[in-house]
Amino acid sequence: MAIQVNINRESWPLESEFRISRGSRKVSEVITVSISDGNLSGRGECFPYARYNETLDSVEKQIFSIIPELNEKPCREYLRKVLPPGAARNAVDCALWDLEAKKANCRMWELAGLSAPEPLTTVYTLGVDEPEKMGELAFENSNRPILKLKMTGDGFDFDRVERIHKNAPNTKLVVDANEGWTIEQYVEYAPRFKKLGVIMIEQPLPADQDSQLASIPHPITVCADESCHDTSTLKGLVGKYEMINIKLDKTGGLTEALELKEAASNLGFQIMVGCMIGTSLAMAPGLVAGQGASVVDLDGPLLLKDDREHGLEFIGSTINVPSSLLWG
């Protein structure tokens, strides 16, 4: 029996405007994919990202283009041959995992031969704002074990971190420049931030300029985000970074994410598992990939006004294992 593929666009308003170095947004625009074999269906969600030349239209077009192939070979390995890494493949890959688990009447991790996931502690992200405002938000969230701070390279980033550390002195900090710094700013900030509770700096330089990181000291762990997509990009990161950020919208799904995690660990990289801003449906596969990671950034639903039905349970910054009614 032929499978049925349904593709939907969804808009999820954010709790407040979220700003990074490249711009801001008030709504998360996602695409969901449902794949049904007539009796059971699996779901996946992705976030088309302009940084990677993705739009809602382009991602939809990619998914529509492979429906004939999915009818012939509805399997994840074949999917990797017909779609490149990216948001479209992520939604389909995760939907196939969900469908396979339902057909096997087991949880996804059992199907994959993995141990059952445990609850994870996620960072909580503060978008870019004036130093005083970010300091206020840090105080409101000072009970959280780890905060992630978006930076811009506008000359006020040290003031931001200083104010945040003052208002949340016992909280670990992760700084994310989203490619917004120069090498001079990195050299200036890194040793100073180390004294302010910062444990990691994420993607300080533009991806096409990160070779400069290989020739300077790293007083704080440096993590590749925009420079790291899938296993094919991994070897080029050696000597520049100590950690990689695995996002399923970059890897093209959980299948590649699990392989990237293993390959990166074998090369000595620490692991971070991150996300775009999406609902719990997008976070649930990330929770599987995030087992044992040094840093987990799966706070997307906490930034939304509302989450979808059967969403993940967050107790403070702790994420509990997803219900099978959600995914997997």
Per-segment meaning from a language model:
Residues 294-297:
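Short helix/strand-capping turn motifs
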Residues 1-173, 180-187, 192-195, 308-328:
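N-terminal capping/lid subdomain adjacent to the active-site entrance of alpha/beta enzymes
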Residues 301:
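Active-site cofactor/co-catalyst pockets and adjacent glycine-rich loops in catalytic enzymes
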Residues 154-291, 305-317:
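Catalytic core of soluble alpha/beta enzymes
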